[in-house]
């Protein structure tokens, strides 16, 4: 079966998180429309993400060779194994759904830490000295969706200035070779439950068109 990797980046439980509420509605609808998929879930607030240390790398975005690995202590070796596991999990998927709130014009830090782990030479990208890096995830059909919640309602101009997260995620996906990308915004969650529910309902109405855009 094909695999949908559902990545959440919010410490709130699903019933309190607008992005995770819409994310759940999205993946459920996707699986209804595409029965040949199975889902794998990754909560970046519950999953350990290694901090990248220089000892783990032979060169930029390239993990150490076997000899250097054997010189690491047990904890360091476990961290390298975790990086490999996260990268392999990402590479094996066909569709990626990331649900996160907009924080500080971007997204919560665990998502950046995760991305730093999976952008790996020889697995998701090909990096050669003196040459432009090339994404390796164009080897089969793939698609990605970024679901983002934000308290404010943003017009086009404000979005260009304030919303860096969507643009970064789209850029990093395409950098790895994933060309099909869609955003699903949960804008205007505001400060009241009514505002939040309206924003969620509006986003859910767009789910089918977003699914059709990636698969």
From Swiss-Prot:
Query: What reaction does this enzyme carry out catalytically?
Result: 2 a quinone + NADH + H(+) = 2 a 1,4-benzosemiquinone + NAD(+); N,N-dimethyl-1,4-phenylenediamine + anthranilate + 2 NAD(+) = 2-(4-dimethylaminophenyl)diazenylbenzoate + 2 NADH + 2 H(+)
Which keywords annotate this record?
Answer: Flavoprotein, FMN, NAD, Oxidoreductase
* Keyword Flavoprotein part of the UniProt annotation: yes
Instruction: Write down the required cofactor(s).
Output: FMN
The UniProt entry, under Gene3D superfamilies, shows: 3.40.50.360
Its Enzyme Commission number? Answer: 1.6.5.-, 1.7.1.17
Q: How is the cofactor bound?
A: Binds 1 FMN per subunit.
* GO MF: electron transfer activity; FMN binding; oxidoreductase activity, acting on NAD(P)H as acceptor; oxidoreductase activity, acting on NAD(P)H, quinone or similar compound as acceptor
- Do the record's keywords include ATP-binding? no
Entry superkingdom: Bacteria
Q: Where does FMN bind?
A: 17-19
- Class of enzymatic activity (EC top level): oxidoreductase
Q: How does it assemble?
A: Homodimer.
Function (record text): Quinone reductase that provides resistance to thiol-specific stress caused by electrophilic quinones. Also exhibits azoreductase activity. Catalyzes the reductive cleavage of the azo bond in aromatic azo compounds to the corresponding amines.
Question: Per its UniProt record, what HAMAP family does this chain match?
Answer: Azoreductase_type1
Protein family: Belongs to the azoreductase type 1 family.
Q: What is this protein called?
A: FMN-dependent NADH:quinone oxidoreductase
The source organism is: Clostridium botulinum (strain Alaska E43 / Type E3)
């Amino acid at each position: 079966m094909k695999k949908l990797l559902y990545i959440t980046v919010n410490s709130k439980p699903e019933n309190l998180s607008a992005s995770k509420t819409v994310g759940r509605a999205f993946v459920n609808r996707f699986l209804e429309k595409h029965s040949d998929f199975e889902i794998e879930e990754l909560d970046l607030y519950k999953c350990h993400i290694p901090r990248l240390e220089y000892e783990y790398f032979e060169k930029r975005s390239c993990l150490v060779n076997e000899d250097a690995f054997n010189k690491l202590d047990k904890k360091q070796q476990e961290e390298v194994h975790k990086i490999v596991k996260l990268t392999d999990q990402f590479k094996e998927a066909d569709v990626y759904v990331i649900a996160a709130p907009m924080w500080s014009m971007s997204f919560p830090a665990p998502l950046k830490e995760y991305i730093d782990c999976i952008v790996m030479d020889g697995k998701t990208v090909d990096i050669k000295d003196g040459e432009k890096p090339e994404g390796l995830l164009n080897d089969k059909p793939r698609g990605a969706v970024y679901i983002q919640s934000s308290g404010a309602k943003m017009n086009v101009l404000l979005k260009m200035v304030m919303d860096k997260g969507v643009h970064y995620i789209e850029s990093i996906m395409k950098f790895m070779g994933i060309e099909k990308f869609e955003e699903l915004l949960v804008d205007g969650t505001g400060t009241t439950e009514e505002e939040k529910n309206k924003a969620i309902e509006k986003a859910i109405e767009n789910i089918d068109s977003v699914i059709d855009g990636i698969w």
